[in-house]
Amino acid sequence: MIKVTVGNNVKREAVIIDENTSLRSCLEANGVDYTRGVMHLDGSSLNPGDLDKTFQQFGITEKCFLLNVVKADNA
């Protein structure tokens, strides 16, 4: 089990999940809209197809941040 801080610019929540969970499943289970903005895993931008990989495939074993960052038009 791993601790994932999941959320966006405004709201973040720490959840405990199985490391064999896909990133997409984690986001959907926690109500995070990943269709807008840039997805980051521990500060690194995710690439196409990465959402269907598991935390274990990324080498996450204890804790991480999974965040959707939306930039404002004037930012």
Residue ranges of model-derived segments:
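Ubiquitin-like/PB1-type beta-grasp interaction modules and other compact soluble beta-rich domains
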Residues: 1-75
